[in-house]
Amino acid sequence: IGREQLRPYDVQLHDGAVVDARKIEGGFEVTLDGGQEVACRKLILATGMTDVLPESPGLRELWGKSVIHCPYCHGWEFRGRRWAFLVPADTVVETATLLSGWTTKLTLLTNGPSEVSAEHRAWLEGRAVEIVEGRIERLEGDGDELKAIHVEGGRRLDRDVLFVHGRLRQASDLAVRLGCSLVDTGPKAGVVKADPFGATEVEGLYVAGDASESGVPSVASAVAEGAVAAAFACRAIFTEDARRPPGGPVRRG
């Protein structure tokens, strides 16, 4: 559908994976996996992020089904059910507050020695959030459904959903290779530093979607960021062309 909608416009489509990109005079040059090189004046990266999941056996098989990372995406389907959550110690109160919008049956898993502060522990206990310490040995599932979480010491927790806030890493190193900086701390750690319009520290290079600092990780946000980045990249080209002397050469590539 997207290709068909682009047909009336002056757009070139190239099939293939980008294996390299470099800054050249006047823009960028991109190399595809088939060896083809494509030059452009502005470049928008929409390469996304990759989830770095805990190594607990059985978790990966249930990922995106009953092991989830976004309560806004899956919360309604699991409302009122038995939830467990595995998050960094400094975010337990924030996470429990968020998840309580969908259920009051909450269990915090520490997956090892607890690093939860005494203050946060008291807050959780005051709201009937169970805290289970110990390493997760495996997840037991039936098809797409989580049935139980097995914790060291032989303890079995019957739960319906596990919320995991794992780490993210760039799905591609193109941004770093082109000279971009990544956010190094906080909830946005690992994303490319960019302004609200997707512009990075590298002149002419934009980023959109989950890989960018400018939005939130969702399909709707990624689409919106792509539209904004494209508009501002286009505006930058028009601005450059308008500054050229009358009759001077104008690059259209």
Q: Where are the predicted features?
A:
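A Rossmann-like FAD-binding core segment of flavoenzymes
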Residues: 3-24, 30-32, 37-38, 101-190, ...
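FAD-binding core/adjacent interface of flavoenzyme oxidoreductases
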Residues: 13-81, 161, 192-197
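Short, well-ordered coil/turn residues at beta-beta hairpins
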Residues: 40, 46-48, 53-55, 86, ...
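FAD-site-proximal beta/loop scaffold in flavoenzymes
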Residues: 61-77, 168-216, 235
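Cofactor-binding loop segments of dinucleotide-utilizing enzymes, especially the Rossmann-like FAD-
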Residues: 72, 88, 111-113, 210
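Rossmann-like NAD(P)H-binding beta-loop-alpha module
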Residues: 81-102
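A conserved FAD-binding loop/helix module that cradles the flavin
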Residues: 93-95, 208-253
